[in-house]
């Protein structure tokens, strides 16, 4: 069985910064500056807004309105759906808005697009540099853990684990992000509704990422624990269920081999119990992948394996298997 399909991103990190803007009264500005801001607002498309913003900054670099203009333009970039185009806009943005706090403003959007473009190593490196300066940035901590887990999966080689530093740093970022999400530590100034949605959608994915990292660190027991937590929060996610099925299959196979070598009744009982657990996870995985074109081949493999195990435990019959799978279908 394939260990892990590419981890699916449940929600983009984009448009975080607009949730952190100050809502205070705007400072008084000159008529010329007001017109420059209106030109940015009226500009059609992000490219034109960036041009107008560059003109604005040239003449108003010290203005108290600069942070708001930067936040507005950053938000417009975050709404762009084409990741390669968005990365180009981010590069353009940082040429105009070159203050450290302005770079921080656009950083989650850049990392989000790198992840969305499967440039996991670049995303991981960008995020790692950022959290050296801002260690409590839960958005970027989450991104680093997610990018690290995907990079670990992409770099897997037979008998050769991913780089230890990658696993260590991704694990640390994931652990801190989980701690903050579990404790409901909403960042100061972040919109409560945005935080709630972010927390609910990303907590199971962070547990999944931790499971992937532990899996490739050769800690299958720890990986299973994290993946079970992820499944408890989101019981319909195919990658989580596929990895759990893979881990359970390995556990069952090892018990079966031990029984064949030692022929002890206790080992047989343990192996059969493990098979029943595996059947349950395979049924969940079958339910989650059925009808999904991305997992068509995997679903067939799962069903073949599931039918064999189920029949073995039910006197060669598969009566009731459809009902078992149906039980785990998403409502």
Regions found by a protein language model. Give the residues of each.
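Short solvent-exposed coil/turn linkers within tandem alpha-helical repeat scaffolds
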Residues: 59-68, 95-105, 132-139, 182-201, ...
């Amino acid at each position: 069985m394939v260990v892990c399909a590419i981890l699916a991103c449940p929600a983009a990190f984009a448009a975080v910064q607009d949730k952190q803007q100050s809502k205070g009264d705007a400072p008084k500005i000159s008529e010329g500056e007001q017109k420059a801001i209106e030109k940015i607002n009226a500009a059609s498309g992000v490219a034109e807004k960036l041009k107008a913003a560059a003109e604005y900054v040239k003449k108003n670099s010290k203005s108290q309105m600069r942070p708001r203009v930067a936040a507005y333009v950053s938000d417009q970039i975050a709404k762009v759906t084409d990741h390669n185009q968005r990365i180009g806009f981010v590069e353009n943005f940082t040429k105009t808005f070159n203050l450290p706090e302005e770079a921080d403003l656009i950083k989650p959007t850049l990392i989000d697009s790198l992840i969305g473009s499967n440039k996991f190593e670049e995303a991981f490196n960008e995020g790692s540099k950022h959290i050296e300066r801002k260690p409590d940035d839960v958005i970027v901590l989450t991104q680093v853990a997610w990018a690290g887990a995907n990079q670990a999966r992409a770099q897997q080689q037979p008998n050769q684990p991913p780089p230890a530093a990658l696993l260590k740093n991704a694990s640390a970022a994931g652990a801190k992000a989980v701690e903050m999400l579990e404790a409901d530590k909403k960042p100061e100034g972040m919109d409560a509704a945005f935080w709630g949605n972010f927390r609910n959608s990303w907590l199971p994915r962070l547990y999944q990422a931790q499971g992937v990292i532990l899996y490739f660190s050769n800690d299958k027991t720890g990986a299973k624990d994290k993946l079970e937590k992820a499944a408890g929060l989101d019981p319909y996610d195919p990658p989580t269920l596929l990895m759990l099925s893979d881990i359970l299959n390995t556990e069952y196979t090892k018990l079966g081999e031990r029984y064949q070598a030692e022929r002890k009744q206790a080992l047989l009982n343990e192996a059969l119990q493990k098979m029943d657990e595996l059947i349950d996870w395979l049924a969940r995985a079958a339910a989650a992948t059925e009808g999904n074109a991305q997992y068509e081949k995997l679903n067939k493999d799962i069903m073949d394996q599931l039918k064999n195990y189920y029949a073995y435990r039910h006197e060669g019959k598969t009566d009731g298997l459809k009902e078992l799978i149906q039980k785990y279908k998403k409502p």
